[in-house]
């Protein structure tokens, strides 16, 4: 994962909370987990096919995906990327608005 993208992602990731009863395993590197999750989401492979080369177990990757989804990480990251690209003048909002206007809504939707 490029350092520039990680600089946007890292502050948005919820901080690891140690178990109150102690024990458990050492926390896994957030960057490795994020990279593994993005791989699963973009490659078309299933969670069970996550290559071990990422250094993240399937249960850990899936658990963090679920936790981060509940914490709205993906929505906040999307907004952060749009803000960054917008500040550079690299977003064509006229096209985004046109695309949004051409999406058909369901009957009864507001």
Segments predicted by a language model, with ranges:
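Short alpha-helical elements
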Residues: 1-110
């Amino acid at each position: 994962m490029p350092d520039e993208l990680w600089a946007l992602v890292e502050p948005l990731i919820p901080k690891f909370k140690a178990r109150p009863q102690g024990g458990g395993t050492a926390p896994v590197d957030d960057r490795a987990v994020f990279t593994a999750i993005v791989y699963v989401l973009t490659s078309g492979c299933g969670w069970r096919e996550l290559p071990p080369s990422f250094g993240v177990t399937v249960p850990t990757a899936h658990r963090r995906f679920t936790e981060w989804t509940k914490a709205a990480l993906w929505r906040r990251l999307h907004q952060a990327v749009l803000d960054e690209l917008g500040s550079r003048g690299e977003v064509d909002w006229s096209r985004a608005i046109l695309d949004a206007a051409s999406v058909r809504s369901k009957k009864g939707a507001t």
